[in-house]
Amino acid sequence: MESYIQDLKDDRQKKSDIVVTIDGLAGAGKGTLAEQVSDILGLKHFSASDVFYSIAEERNLSDHELSEEAEKEVDLAVDRKTLERALNQDCVIDSRISSWVLGTYSDLRIRLEADIEERARRVAERENISTEKARKIIEKRDKGDKKRYSQYYSIDLENKEIYDLLIDNTDLGIEEQRKVVKKAIEKRFDHK
């Protein structure tokens, strides 16, 4: 992939043994599953959202406002920090594109999906807003993310070939997801 991502990785040595990346769009359940995987493996959990929120706070913007601005420098700062964390310690990272950012530095790449209605319900509950408002925010954000990632990184969010595990959790609870991922972890890392 010819993009800035390669520049982020050049001349970097991986000092970690296990890095798990969990990708998905807004409301897909990345953070929730990442906490479970972190618990299973006993690893630190990092969320690219935390870096994003801290940048929004520094600029006195809501995360929705910053997402609308979505300056290239913000995306690159988040991705650089994500990569630095993954290279320096065993961890679980969740973001929309962490598997793309880390590429082969990720030892297990998971993609979560859920239909728009379920994602809107989750975001509405988390943000304490109406489901309709959440849906509009998600649709706008998904469209913007897809365009940005294509422009900045040549990433096609529809391309799922890089993932080791795809989970549609529209109708799956967290315990069911945990079981699926635990089996994949046991197979990949001989971890029980």
Residue ranges with predicted function:
Residues M1-D17:
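Extreme N-terminal, non-catalytic leader segments
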Residues T131-V180:
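Small-molecule kinase domains that catalyze NTP-dependent phosphoryl transfer to phosphate-bearing small molecules
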Residues I22:
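Hydrophobic anchor at the beta1->P-loop junction of P-loop NTPases
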Residues I40, K44-L102, I116-E118, E125-K136, ...:
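ATP-dependent small-molecule kinase phosphotransfer cores
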Residues A28:
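ATP-binding Walker
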Residues L25:
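P-loop (Walker A) phosphate-binding loop of NTP-binding proteins
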Residues G31:
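Walker A/P-loop
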